[in-house]
Regions:
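Catalytic tyrosine of NAD(P)H-dependent dehydrogenase/reductases that use a Tyr as the general acid/base
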Residues: 155-156, 192
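Short, polar N-cap/turn motifs at the start of nucleic acid-interacting alpha helices
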Residues: 58-65, 171-191
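C-terminal catalytic core of tyrosine-transesterase DNA break-rejoin enzymes
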Residues: 39, 43, 49-50, 136, ...
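Basic, Lys/Arg- and aromatic-enriched nucleic-acid-binding interface segment
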Residues: 1-54, 62, 91-92, 159
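C-terminal secondary-structure termini that scaffold catalytic or DNA-interacting sites
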Residues: 63, 74-76, 81-92, 99-101, ...
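Catalytic-site neighborhood detector that most strongly recognizes the C-terminal catalytic loop/helix
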Residues: 7-8, 16, 72, 180-205
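Active-site/catalytic core of tyrosine-dependent DNA strand-transfer enzymes
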Residues: 19-20, 98-151
């Protein structure tokens, strides 16, 4: 039996962007700060609080990594927010950054350093002296989905999209679990078993195609 806060609430369907859908979504984003936000969510599988909690000192440009070591909670407006530890101990993690994302982050930092008064490494990557509020991020996401002509997904579905990308690229369950910061591998399996089944089916179809091609050569 599921234990929901609202007894009338139904579990929300898990949706995710394919890589091509995400590229369409990203192509309509002209704001460098939000380009970085979407890529951090999609390629790093971050929770929304983790995204908002990233400061510039968490970005290691030399080693191409981002350190996830805190999250933002209790935020009702730009001036009211607080830090808290990540959801679990395993949620403290260091994740690799793609070359494109790293370059966008460099451009963003250069821009912020010029236009934000008192800029330093304690400033928020997705924000300024204060983190961006979730409602603004969600509104921007909704608009981009419409402009790009892709399905509407929740902010948390970017995390599922990341898991889907990792699985279809052949990442094992242990790697996916560590990447997402899950406490136990069982959590990853329970959440994404259907994706692994789909990936295995695709692999089987690929082998069948290879076998058919080999037979046609005889």
């Amino acid at each position: 039996m599921h234990n929901f806060n609202n007894p009338n609430e139904l579990p929300k369907e898990m949706l995710y962007f394919t890589y091509d859908e995400f590229q369409k979504f990203l192509s309509v984003e002209k704001d460098i700060k939000f380009r970085c936000a979407w890529q951090l969510l999609y390629y790093c599988g971050l929770r929304i609080g983790e995204l908002k909690g990233i400061t510039w000192k968490d970005i290691d440009f030399e080693n191409r990594t981002v350190s996830i070591n805190k999250q933002i909670t209790q935020q009702s407006c730009r001036s009211r927010w607080s830090f808290s530890p990540p959801k679990t101990a395993k949620s403290n993690r260091v994740l690799p950054l793609t070359k494109v994302l790293l370059n966008d982050l460099k451009l963003l930092k250069e821009s912020d350093s010029k236009i934000l008064f008192g800029f330093n490494d304690t400033y928020f990557v997705i924000g300024d002296i204060a983190p961006q509020i979730s409602s603004t991020i969600t509104a921007k996401k909704n608009r981009n989905c419409e402009l790009a002509g892709v399905k509407q997904i929740r902010i948390h579905d970017f995390r599922h999209s990341c898991a889907s990308l990792l699985i279809y690229k052949g990442a094992n369950i242990n790697t996916v679990s560590k990447f997402l910061g899950h406490t136990k591998i069982e959590e990853t399996l329970n959440t994404y078993t259907h994706l692994y089944k789909n990936a295995l089916t695709d692999i089987t179809a690929l082998i069948d195609d290879m076998n058919n091609e080999q037979k046609s050569n005889f």
